[in-house]
Amino acid sequence: MLELLVALLALALAYFALLDGWYLVRVPCAVLRARLLQPRVRDLLAEQSYAGRVLPSDLDLLLHMNNARYLREADVARIAHLTRCGVLEALRALGARAVLAASCARYRRSLRLFEPFEVRTRLLGWDDRAFYVEARFISLRDGFVCALLRSRQHVLGTSPERVVQHLCKRRVEPPELPADLQHWIAYNEASSQLLRAESGLHDILKEQ
């Protein structure tokens, strides 16, 4: 019995030492909770909330939530959001998937140890290649927006328009994207062109 306990302890230590253990547990739990315990969200543009609290494992050396943790929490909240509104299910039905192609973050105020917060996620819109998602970190102490994250979910294997049409059973015009988001999209495109030029891909693509 003791040997079994030691083996299980060693296995648990190896799991958390070699893998991102809590993340690999939380994501499936978030998906199952969104599917089984929460109601389906029919409005693609509706805001959804995901509750959290700053834990000791989230802290940096200044005892604030580590900047990288915001990206992780936004990732979990985004997966739950896309599950509840049916986007992930539609992607699977179409044999497609969405990958994170770009993100940006604004940090406005630190979240401190044990501070409760909400990640409010919403779909801002889409174009011919990607969905654009926003996540706001709201302190539940005073309602302040502590951080704002935007992400570009690039769709592979189909188009965002087909995903939305699959969900809504009709063609839906995408909403107009906010001006600041349009500037960010333009920045990403300019950055992509610059990187292609640096690697020689720009000339290759033009020849093709």
From Swiss-Prot:
UniProt keyword terms in alphabetical order: Phosphoprotein, Secreted, Signal
Coiled-coil region: none
GO cellular component: extracellular region
Superkingdom of source: Eukaryota
Broad class of the protein's primary localization: secreted
Entry-annotated residues carrying Phosphoserine: 199
Gene3D superfamilies per record: Hotdog Thioesterase (3.10.129.10)
Subcellular compartments: Secreted
Signal peptide: 1-21
InterPro entries: HotDog_dom_sf, THEM6_lcsJ_thioesterase
Family: Belongs to the THEM6 family.
This protein's name: Protein THEM6
Species whose genome carries this gene: Bos taurus (Bovine)
Species lineage: Eukaryota, Metazoa, Chordata, Craniata, Vertebrata
Gene: THEM6
